[in-house]
């Protein structure tokens, strides 16, 4: 089972494309939709939905995957639910760049203070990070600097922030999922 979390643009047709691409790895790909505008509510909703899926799951190596803001959530929810994560261009600093786009961006900073201390150290090697060198929305080098101590970083030379085509990375993701 692969759980897919969309980014801030929940209506992007690229979400359906990524789900179809992920089905080459596992036929059971589940998209969880969330508001993107209410961080504390989103966290509760995502935890509840992922837990529900895991309770009914027969796959002993589930994976959670997210792009952009979905990558932010996939890393955290995956850690809290003890499943491996794959994140594409994760938005690691939404409290800085979501101002004016959502109702309460400061909730992201509050969530960070309430998260497990040094959670990335405890999550070491359980997240695969795929970053675009041509991310027009986020500073991918800042993300790499933040994450490379804990996770493997894979650089993509062609995709932009929304990562329309993940197919060049499917074999790597499949191998990472298999390690589960």
Curated annotation (Swiss-Prot):
HAMAP family: UPF0227. This is UPF0227 protein CKO_01948. It comes from the Bacteria. The lineage of its organism: Bacteria, Pseudomonadati, Pseudomonadota, Gammaproteobacteria, Enterobacterales. Gene3D superfamilies: alpha/beta hydrolase. Coiled coil: none annotated. Belongs to the UPF0227 family.
